[in-house]
């Protein structure tokens, strides 16, 4: 059964773990401002010499997310940030550096592929593969557009740099790259995912061998599912992406790995 950590807080469990994977969006900030309580948690972890990774499904390199965190008020812990975009970039540089790609997502995400931007094509028919970082700015709300766009190209490779389906930017809910990837799968395509809940991002961002690990996040489909796949304990923040479904709780639920079946 899960434990409610609302009263005792994470500090009551801190000595049970050597490594913490902590989500950023929904835990450290809401897309607009930092949650001060979360900074106290990070400070407490550092004080107790605990290792942690600020692991986020963001389709941008580490450096871009760090710049954003600085802008909204995070004053340190930059070296602990790791993004799904960084994991994607590593794979793309190793496997697709000289292949032509079609970018699905807003122009602001260009920094993910600026090292090989010369391979970007504007004609979808010329692409060897797709890089999906999100939705086009003029097609942010209607997913049907992407079914029409991609239905003839399900044989191409599709790299999804953010498995999240949705995100809340303040009080506004937005679709993410994962929603487009899901459509691509529904029309028969195969997707290469980077980020939570898929195992590679955990191994790329930290040495997890032999360590007791706690994953902290607000998304059941990525943070919690990823922890369960890895057989890690996990802490669900109920005030995040699932706040409407869990509005009556407003607590933190700790699930140990032996309770993972309850969340499957």
Residue ranges of model-derived segments:
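Asp-based phosphoryl-transfer active-site loop
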Residues: 17-31
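Short acidic low-complexity segments
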Residues: 7-13, 117-129
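Active-site phosphate-binding/coordination module
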Residues: 40, 46-119
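Single conserved hydrophobic/aromatic residue that forms the stacking wall/gate
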Residues: 255-264
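Acidic, Mg2+-coordinating phosphoryl-transfer loop and its flanking beta/alpha structural elements
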Residues: 216-249
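Short, well-ordered secondary-structure micro-motifs within conserved domains or adaptor modules
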Residues: 124-141
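Short, acidic loop-to-helix structural element flanking the phosphoryl-transfer center
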Residues: 10, 28-53, 61-64, 80-87, ...
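Conserved Lys-Pro-Asp/Glu-containing loop-to-beta segment of HAD-superfamily phosphomonoesterases
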Residues: 193-223
